[in-house]
């Protein structure tokens, strides 16, 4: 079997036939970390290292595992030396998804079919840089070539959304770039919580005297995002918690923290529970899809964190007790308050996949006719792999309805990451193809092909009500 040919990752005849239904579908990338300013300015990339390795902690993590010095990863080594160091790493990375993604990016974006190795690294480095300049490769070109119709960025609640506004006014660019409301700093354990309170007060003209003042100010920002085309929120929790508190307790806690008090574990849980519930009520009011990423233990290597900051490849998947108990309480609390928005839950630890899918199935009832009102999101981060994707789809198929799944997202900082949609589609087609080959479903290529197309694109469009 040939590596990275037209049948890459398509493991059976049924998969190859199903893939014809999805291979030319556009991309609806509803969650990523691209910078809207870069999209608007649309500068031509001059060096492949900036485009391919810069900010990519997946690659940095691999390079450290291969004994590469930090100088050649995030330091001041030359661009060529960094590229060679990555090539030296990549040729030993069989089995890691970065190996597959990189090969697909080289072939499908740049037309380079050779396997990148240390021996040919300099030649390919020069060819890639020549390609960038001759073809004027820029963010918008990469987006257009990948047929991306929608991009959901990740944005601070106090962002001016200046660059989203400029993109919306630019009629020469057809892709919609919408902000996503990401209020990490609204949670009391965040190191910048006090600073966020001050800036929120300045932005809204509201004093943060009581809990209700804080929520009112947050609504002002949510309304502003809605006015600027926002369709979703996002949050990242280390753990899913549920710990009820009286409003008087929250008022007292807010006052103490403003005076420099460090909250204890119980108070952190109480604040998270209360704030998230209030935000969900607002998200429902404003029609935001609520995305919940959970289970990441971040910044574990303290020296690298102090030197380089966050998102540099030193994070892990976590575990927790009472996950389903807390999830059920949290979701039921929202139901009781008529505050349950459409939600996508992304679980980082695959050992919880069945439990999460099973819990979400308890709360699908809605009078709006929404299919899978609560979504079990695609394999995230360390689960964004072949086995991770299959594990997530298995759990969803067994506990819910895979046919209603909103499918893949890049969750990436790289303009080359759209190849991950194709990677997912190939794995999806093999997964569905195995059902056909093993006689688990009827050999109905029209029905299964329609299902694959829905998962690849149309379900997300409908779920986010993209027009």
Swiss-Prot record:
Gene3D superfamilies: Metal-dependent hydrolases, uronate isomerase, domain 2, chain A. Pathway: Carbohydrate metabolism; pentose and glucuronate interconversion. Transmembrane segments: none annotated. One of its GO terms (biological process) is D-glucuronate catabolic process. Pfam families: UxaC. It comes from the Bacteria. It is an enzyme of class 5 (isomerase). It catalyses: D-glucuronate = D-fructuronate; aldehydo-D-galacturonate = keto-D-tagaturonate. Keywords: Isomerase. Its EC number is 5.3.1.12. One of its GO terms (molecular function) is glucuronate isomerase activity. InterPro entries: Metal_Hydrolase, Uronate_isomerase. Belongs to the metallo-dependent hydrolases superfamily. Uronate isomerase family. PANTHER family: URONATE ISOMERASE. This is Uronate isomerase. It comes from Streptococcus uberis (strain ATCC BAA-854 / 0140J).
């Amino acid at each position: 079997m040939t590596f990275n040919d037209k049948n890459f990752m398509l493991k059976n005849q049924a998969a190859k036939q199903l893939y014809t239904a999805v291979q030319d579908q556009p991309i609806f990338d509803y969650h990523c970390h691209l910078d809207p300013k870069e999209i608007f300015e649309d500068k031509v990339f001059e060096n492949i290292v900036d485009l391919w390795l810069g900010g990519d902690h997946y690659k940095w993590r691999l390079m450290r595992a291969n004994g590469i010095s930090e100088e050649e990863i995030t330091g001041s080594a030359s661009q060529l030396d960094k590229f060679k160091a990555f090539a030296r790493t990549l040729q030993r990375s069989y089995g890691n998804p970065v190996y597959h993604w990189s090969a697909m990016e080289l072939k499908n974006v740049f037309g380079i079919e050779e396997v990148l190795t240390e021996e040919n690294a300099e030649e390919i480095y020069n060819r890639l840089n020549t390609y960038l300049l001759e073809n004027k490769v820029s963010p918008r070109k990469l987006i257009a070539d990948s047929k991306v119709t929608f991009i959901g960025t990740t944005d601070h609640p106090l962002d001016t959304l200046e660059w989203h506004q400029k993109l919306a006014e630019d009629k020469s660019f057809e892709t919609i770039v919408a902000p996503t409301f990401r209020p990490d700093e609204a949670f009391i354990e965040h190191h910048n919580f006090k600073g966020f309170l001050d800036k929120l007060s300045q932005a809204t003209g509201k004093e943060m005297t009581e809990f209700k003042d804080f929520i009112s100010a947050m609504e002002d920002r949510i309304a502003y995002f809605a006015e600027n085309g926002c369709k979703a929120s996002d949050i990242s929790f280390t753990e899913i918690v549920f710990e009820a508190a009286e409003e008087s307790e929250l008022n007292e806690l807010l006052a103490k923290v403003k005076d420099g008090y460090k909250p204890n574990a119980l108070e952190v849980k109480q604040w998270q529970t209360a704030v998230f519930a209030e935000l969900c009520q607002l998200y429902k009011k404003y029609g935001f899809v609520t995305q919940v990423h959970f289970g990441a233990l971040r910044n574990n290597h303290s020296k690298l964190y102090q030197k380089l900051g966050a998102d540099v490849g030193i994070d892990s998947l976590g575990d927790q007790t009472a996950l389903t108990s807390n999830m059920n309480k949290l979701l039921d609390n929202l139901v009781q308050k008529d505050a349950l928005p459409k939600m996508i839950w992304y679980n980082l630890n695959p050992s919880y996949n069945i439990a999460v899918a099973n819990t979400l199935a308890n709360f699908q009832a809605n009078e709006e006719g929404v299919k899978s009102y609560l979504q079990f999101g695609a394999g995230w981060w360390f689960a964004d792999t072949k086995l991770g994707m299959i594990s997530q789809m298995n759990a969803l198929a067994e506990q819910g309805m895979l046919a209603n799944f909103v499918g893949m997202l890049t969750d990436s900082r790289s303009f080359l990451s759209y190849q991950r949609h194709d990677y997912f589609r190939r794995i999806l087609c093999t997964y569905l193809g195995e059902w056909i080959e093993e006689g688990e479903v009827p050999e109905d290529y029209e029905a299964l092909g329609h299902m694959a197309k829905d998962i690849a694109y149309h379900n997300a469009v409908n779920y986010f009500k993209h027009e």
